[in-house]
């Protein structure tokens, strides 16, 4: 299962429309006007581009968004977050059906409203991926980031930290060893592991074949959260 959020394409489209995303506590604050752009780009161009790329590589992908089949339901976080919502319910019935048929679900992170205040919310891809992993009983959650955001190995600064114990996360956040941009990803992954996901790993998504190298090599190339 592949989950994606607001990437450079959506940010560029917003910029072209004269809008810019503001971030708060790791969440992009999406206005009503911005949501229209985000939904079009996220569920259209980005989602279908990923589906096409997977299919061309021999996969059998299908594009979905969190609204489809009631997959993701959300409520408002607070007025200051605009139309960015908090995921309150995950229904993986449809996802399991597609998995059983051999499809790779590719999920854009917009959700249906569950609070009567809005029909649609933009939701954090980090939160959505973590909650989906829990609901699916996933063996592994992989969060992709860039090299600058990876957790660095203190003994070899050019290499990622191979393991990170859950108990050490709060202190590393306080000290700044976990960069501000990674705090949200790390916290979501910690919650997923504590909720039953077997393991969570952070990978530099700019490395060619990063996921294969992590899954198929003995040493891996990312940082794995451990109990």
What spans do the regions from the language model cover?
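Nucleotide/pyrophosphate-binding catalytic subdomain
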Residues: 1-206, 213, 219, 227
């Amino acid at each position: 299962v592949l989950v994606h959020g607001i990437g450079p394409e959506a940010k560029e489209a917003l910029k072209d429309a004269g809008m810019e995303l503001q971030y708060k506590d790791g969440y992009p604050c999406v206005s009503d006007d911005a949501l229209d752009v985000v939904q079009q780009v996220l569920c259209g161009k980005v989602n279908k581009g990923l589906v096409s790329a997977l299919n061309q590589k021999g996969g059998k992908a299908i594009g979905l968004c969190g609204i489809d089949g009631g997959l993701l339901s959300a409520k408002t976080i607070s007025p200051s977050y605009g139309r960015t919502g908090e995921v309150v319910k995950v229904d993986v019935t449809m996802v399991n059906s597609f998995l059983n048929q051999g499809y790779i679900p590719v999920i854009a992170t917009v959700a249906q409203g569950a609070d009567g205040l809005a029909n649609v919310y933009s939701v954090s891809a980090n939160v959505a991926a973590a909650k989906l992993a829990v609901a699916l009983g996933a063996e592994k959650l992989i969060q992709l980031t860039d090299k600058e955001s990876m957790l660095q190995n203190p003994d070899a600064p050019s290499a990622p930290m191979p393991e990170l114990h859950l108990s050490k996360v709060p202190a590393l956040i306080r000290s700044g060893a976990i960069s501000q941009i990674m705090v949200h990803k790390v916290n979501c992954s910690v919650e997923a592991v504590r909720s039953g996901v077997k393991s969570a790993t952070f990978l530099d998504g700019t490395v060619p074949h990063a996921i294969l190298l992590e899954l198929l090599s003995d040493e891996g190339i990312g940082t794995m959260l451990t109990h």
